[in-house]
A protein has these predicted regions:
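Walker A (P-loop) ATP-phosphate-binding motif of ABC ATPase nucleotide-binding domains
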Residues: 2
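Conserved lysine of the Walker
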Residues: 13
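ATP-dependent NMP and nucleoside kinases share a basic, alpha-helical "lid"
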Residues: 84-160
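Hydrophobic positions on the alpha1 helix immediately C-terminal to the Walker A/P-loop
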Residues: 16
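Hydrophobic anchor at the beta1->P-loop junction of P-loop NTPases
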Residues: 5
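N-terminal phosphate/diphosphate-binding loop that engages ATP/GTP or pyrophosphate donors
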Residues: 22-90
Length: 228
């Protein structure tokens, strides 16, 4: 079975998808992390992000793998090096929409994504899972949330391993800054020519703003159980 969870940045896709996969014993595929990996690799190697041919070539060359770390964490490596934290920086946030819009990059990632789902139960999350990657997925969910709540979640995710927690003032200031970036990314993701961020016609819409993680997981697991 394939469960497709699409939605904008900060809607809770990664957290929800990870928990569903854990509870049901499914494999988890974070396609957004793959595009972040290409973006980080390009920035790290000093490749001009406007050089589409160079970015396309990079996407074909690098080896992106997901491996289990301690506990339930899934680690992402690029050519054998752990990049799990490096792909979640503001610099990557600001540039991943540009990189992921390149048709060559999407084509390279699509091959890996479909291969990962062969002969296994999988929870895949991203922006075009139900429309492009797995259009025949048995369960399709389009997950949304209030933009400011999404920005708050993204900031908390970014600082979850900090030794010193953010003050209330620091949190609100960073949320304001992140909200502007999220709105810009929403615009870019929704308007790109290749695989834009749009819900599949047969997707179930779930607004996670006022729900806990467990509540959203329960809603989606009910859908899965109905279609098994």
């Amino acid at each position: 079975m394939i469960v497709a969870i699409d939605g904008p940045a900060g809607s809770g896709k990664s957290t929800i998808g990870k928990e569903i996969a854990r509870q049901l014993g499914f494999n988890k595929l974070d396609t957004g992390a793959m595009y972040r990996a290409v973006t980080f690799a390009a920035l790290d190697r000093g490749i001009d992000l406007d050089d589409e041919a160079a970015i396309d070539a990079l996407a074909e060359q690098i080896e992106i793998r997901f491996t289990n770390g301690t506990g339930e964490d899934t680690r992402l490596t690029i050519d054998g090096q752990d990049a799990s934290a490096a792909i979640r920086t503001p610099q990557v946030d600001a540039n991943v929409s540009k990189v992921s819009a390149y048709p060559g990059v999407r084509a390279a990632m699509l091959i890996h994504q479909r291969r990962a789902a062969e002969d296994r139960d999988i929870v895949a999350e991203g922006r075009d899972i139900g429309t492009v990657v797995f259009p025949n997925a048995q369960v399709k969910v389009f997950l949304t949330a209030d933009p400011r709540e999404r920005a708050r979640r993204r900031v908390l995710q970014r600082h979850q391993n900090d030794a010193q927690p953010l003050t209330a003032e620091q949190l609100e200031a960073e949320v304001d800054e992140t909200l502007d970036a999220l709105k810009q990314r929403d615009k870019l993701d929704s308007s790109r020519e290749v695989a834009p961020l749009v819900p599949a016609e047969d997707a179930v819409h779930v607004d996670s703003t006022a729900h806990t993680i467990d509540e959203v997981v329960s809603i989606i697991e009910d859908l899965i159980n109905q279609r098994r």
